A protein has these predicted regions:
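Bacterial Sec-dependent N-terminal signal peptides
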Residues: 1-28
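Charge-rich (acidic/polar
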Residues: 23-134
């Protein structure tokens, strides 16, 4: 299970990158949207299974991911259209939105759920973001 928790965030990021690279052509906006919504659905299901979320919590997690991941995607697209090549800027955008998601999760989850989420990978992700800030 720990292996899954380690691999899942990396796989989720690659979920958006690898299919486009494998096709050697840009994905259509519809394909990108479908892929993002599939990822959001899987992540909501994963968190529901791990944390035993109530229905209203599932709704807020889904809404948070939908809003924040779309906002992150839009910000990354604006960097790409400006032809920014500095990967640190892209990671900064990603870290900013992942931090925002964690802040929102902390408000949605009860204390026991937050501790379980934090131990299942949230804390490690935060440490990695903190290292990149230095």
């Amino acid at each position: 299970m720990k292996f899954f928790r380690l691999i899942f965030p990396c796989a989720a990021i690659l979920l958006f990158v690898l299919p486009a690279a494998a096709q050697n052509q840009p994905q259509s906006p519809e394909q990108q949207e479908k892929q993002m919504m599939e990822y959001i659905d899987k992540e909501v299901k994963r968190l529901t299974d791990i944390l035993d979320l109530e229905y209203w919590q599932e709704f807020y997690v889904d809404s948070t991911l939908t809003h924040d991941l779309h906002a992150m995607s839009d910000e990354i697209k604006s960097l790409q259209s400006a032809k920014v090549e500095n990967s640190d800027l892209y990671m900064g955008v990603r870290d900013k939105w992942m931090e925002q998601i964690d802040v929102t999760y902390k408000r949605i989850f009860n204390e026991a759920q937050w501790k379980k989420y934090w131990k299942s990978g949230g804390q490690r992700a935060q440490r990695e973001r903190d290292k990149r800030k230095k």
